[in-house]
Amino acid sequence: MEDSPTMVKVDRGENQILSCRGRRCGFKVLGYVTGDMKEFANWLKDKPVVLQFMDWILRGISQVVFVSNPISGILILVGLLVQNPWWALCGCVGTVVSTLTALLLSQDRSAIAAGLQGYNATLVGILMAVFSNKGDYFWWLIFPVSAMSMTCPVFSSALSSVLSKWDLPVFTLPFNMALSMYLSATGHYNTFFPSKLFTPVSSVPNITWSELSALELLKSLPVGVGQIYGCDNPWTGGIFLCAILLSSPLMCLHAAIGSLLGVIAGLSLAAPFEDIYFGLWGFNSSLACIAIGGMFMALTWQTHLLALACALFTAYFGACMAHLMAVVHLPACTWSFCLATLLFLLLTTKNPNIYRMPLSKVTYSEENRIFYLQNKKRMVESPL
């Protein structure tokens, strides 16, 4: 009987040890599926090429939002299927064709493995389906989708050779160039592949502020993120946010903030409510906020504020680009995000807390911040 308390203490100690081990095991498993899943990529290196290729495709789909995570890619694919299976199919075709073209052109294998040779064609495939005037399941569209997807690695390689002189990424410039080229060549009145008609605003929009819906504004936040892929379903946008969250909570936070700032910018310019609800004011600013807020600049309070400024600037610049592009009957796409973010990345400052990441070291926000802090520590310890 005297030994009973001792036995209880031992049992409690064992339970605490098992609980700690369980938590550590849980964190370890979570570490394998979050971030850029580097361990999984290393594990795949000696596996069949088919498995590696599937990983590259899924990473390409997720790289549109700066995420290199195959599970995030699966979630984004699910979101696309919720929105429209035909759009999802065209996006997958574009990603596959672009990745294969990059392999044939002997592009950098590490970039291909990270999905960097697929994401532009993902957008090309989806947006060609979105802007097609033939509706869903117009199977002949697969041919121009494949053809334009082949141009993406060419555009990427050419732009990279120029922008690499300043250590800058190509972003979605290849997508903008490929889609603009296709829509310019076909247009609304093409017999085979007619597209939607884009026209400049020709009258003052009828806006009644009392009709502004708080619920619709709330829904426009995930819709703004969804419009990065051309999707207007709030559930799809929510799935995309979950996909980003899995890889990087900081990137997810900035994606949501960027979409919110786009809504604020739209309201400040008295934009038609339908455009705001449709997410057209949120997607460019969302991308810009992610890019500056921890992706290509190490996250500090200074760069966080800079990301907010860049998001607002991008939203206003997006309105400018929409008006200009409509004159030549083209959509604004993500031109404003690319140009505005490149402008902010070229910013020079003597503030050590505004640190632009070397392009070769960019991974995801949390890892980028660790690199920045380690580099800062080394500079303090050995200033020479």
UniProtKB/Swiss-Prot annotation:
The chain crosses the membrane at residues 61-81, 85-105, 111-131, 138-158, 168-188, 250-270, 276-296, 305-325, 327-347. Expressed in brain, kidney, heart, liver, lung, skeletal muscle, spleen, testis, ureter and urinary bladder (at protein level). Along the gastrointestinal tract, detected in colon, jejunum and stomach (at protein level). In the kidney, expressed in some microvessels of the inner and outer medulla, but not all (at protein level). Not detected in the cortex (at protein level). Detected in the urothelium all along the urinary tract, including the papilla surface, the ureter, the bladder and the urethra (at protein level). InterPro entries: Ammonium/urea_transptr, Urea_transporter. It holds the Pfam family UT. GO terms for molecular function: urea channel activity; urea transmembrane transporter activity; water transmembrane transporter activity. It is found in: Cell membrane; Basolateral cell membrane. One of its GO terms (biological process) is water transport. Disruption phenotype: Mutant mice exhibit grossly normal appearance, activity and behavior. Plasma sodium, potassium, chloride, bicarbonate and creatinine concentrations, as well as hematocrit, are similar to wild type animals. Urea permeability in erythrocytes is 45-fold lower than that from wild-type mice. Daily urine output is 1.5-fold greater and urine osmolarity is lower than in wild-type mice. After 24 hours of water deprivation, plasma urea concentration is 30% higher and urine urea concentration 35% lower in mutant mice than in wild-type animals. Glycans are attached at residue 206. It catalyses: urea(in) = urea(out). This is Urea transporter 1. The lineage of its organism: Eukaryota, Metazoa, Chordata, Craniata, Vertebrata.
